[in-house]
Amino acid sequence: MDNCIVCKSKCLDIFLKVDDLTYWKCKFCEAKFLDKKNYISYNEEKKHYLKHNNSLSDQGYRDFLQCLIKPLKDKISNNDFGLDYGCGYAPALTDIFKKDGFNIDVYDPFFFPNQNIFLKKFKFIACSEVVEHLFKPYEEFIKIDNLMDLNAWFGVMTSFMTEDFLFKNWHYRRDPTHVVFYKKKTFKVIASQRRWKVLFPSKNIALFNKIDLS
């Protein structure tokens, strides 16, 4: 690996080798990520997502999504146009926002690959359990930045890393589609590389605000 896939720093070391997998660490942004040679194929990844039991009628899953929805709704108004980025095959987050009166679009590279969304601007973008799957997070965050209107909010929910020594036995690492892992420091670096402020309103939640510097 030549560069960190999150921040493009060259300050990399091998972090861990386990179960025939190699993980790298960035000494600048503190992200940990899987070596590219260990990525599963597109078809394997899609098959794995189809096993998720994230139906629109699953109340437990809908309650879980409120962990992101509630702090994000505190920052936006009902007439704001939003995007569920990486919505999966059953966009429950979109369904909740729509039932609350919001106008929201969907995008998912596997299930809703509508490229027209990249011609639009949004006042809020929600990514629930998405960023840990990104093979090219630096480039994806550029895409998201381009989708954000001025003063827009971008909400992320993912399991934050804690202590490095816990990583080997962390259940979150064992999902074959989870390839990149973040700390608060990582999200602060992501924000600093763009016109974003970042807040951490609750556990495993990051809210980014695209500020107007004009």
Model-derived segments and their meaning:
Residues 134-135, 148-150:
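Helix-to-beta-strand junctions that scaffold the AdoMet/dcAdoMet cofactor pocket
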Residues 151-160:
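Conserved beta-strand signature within the Rossmann-like core of class I S-adenosyl-L-methionine
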